[in-house]
Amino acid sequence: MGAGILPTTIRNGKIWFLFGKENKFEKSAPGFSDFGGGKDNNETPLETAIREGGEELTGFLGTDEQLKKQLKAHGTYNIDFAENKYRTHIFPMKYDPYLEKYYNNNQKFIQKRLDPNIIKTSKIFEKAEIKWICIDDLPKMKPKFRHFFVNIVDQIIQQKTEIAAFIAKSNGTRKSRE
């Protein structure tokens, strides 16, 4: 089963998700999605999600061990696509208004200077951009998502009440630990 991570926060009373956009060389399924991919060997879906998330976010959310610790500390809200095909692990994350800017500037800088063949073949350049997207904007943004991820977007919209409760509960837990 393939899997990915989807950082989520509550900001100004609304749910926000951090999505990644594929680089310009992805022609078969361009657009936004979570940070994920296929499993390696005998990985669990969570192990796959952590490895893929670390690769696609190029360490911006920490090492694999730091991501694992964060996901295990607060748990994940899971959305499955086509039973046993793909799982998105939604997890709470503190909103960082500069994360988009730093990641996107870093990617632009590096990708402008590297040989395009490196960008095409390296796992760490799959996402050219990240973006915080409010749940209220998901319906109109559906055409901008990767075609296979639209089903997960639909499930996120349908389950927004449960996701909000999960994130709010986790945020309360995090605040008590700080």
Predicted regions and their residues:
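Extracellular/periplasmic catalytic domains that process cell-envelope and extracellular macromolecules
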Residues: 11-12, 80-83, 123-125
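The catalytic Nudix box helix
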Residues: 34-74, 89
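Conserved, well-structured beta-alpha core segment at the onset of a catalytic domain
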Residues: 13, 21-28, 61, 72-80, ...
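N-terminal strand-loop-strand
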Residues: 1-35, 89
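Acidic, glycine-rich loop-and-strand cores that form catalytic or ligand-binding grooves
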Residues: 62-115
